[in-house]
């Protein structure tokens, strides 16, 4: 079971569904990381469509660039399916993810201070 497995969701290691008293609650990892000092870019993306894959790739590139530029730490969380574990076709799994996971784990940038870091470097070239 992943940290993001939803309550009641069945997995191969949790065949009766995630129960909070037994397995704990799902973790909003990106929201937690966004509050940490030193993070500059925290985002949640998905891979359910070509457009979503392109956004995820751009987010990964941006995270690497932020690291190269010395802006701080980045975290890119990728929501994806587990077709075989969910016993669904890929299309069914994508639909299930859109209908169930996106409500709990909304996609998009949660923290982005990379532009601020870039502006600071331009104002003080020694950074």
PLM segments and residue spans:
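Glycine-rich ThDP/TPP pyrophosphate-binding loop and its adjacent helix/strand module
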Residues: 1-126
């Amino acid at each position: 079971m992943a940290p993001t497995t939803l309550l009641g969701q069945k997995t191969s290691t949790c065949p009766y569904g995630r129960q909070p008293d037994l397995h704990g609650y799902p973790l909003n990892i990106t929201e937690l990381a966004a509050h940490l000092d030193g993070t500059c870019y925290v985002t949640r993306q998905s891979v359910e469509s070509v457009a979503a894959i392109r956004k995820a790739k751009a987010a990964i590139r941006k995270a690497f660039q932020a690291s190269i530029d010395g802006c701080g730490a980045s975290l890119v969380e990728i929501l994806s399916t587990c077709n075989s574990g969910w016993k669904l076709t890929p299309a069914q799994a994508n639909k299930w993810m859109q209908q169930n996971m996106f409500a709990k784990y909304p996609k998009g940038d949660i923290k982005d201070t990379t532009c601020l870091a870039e502006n600071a470097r331009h104002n003080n070239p020694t950074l």
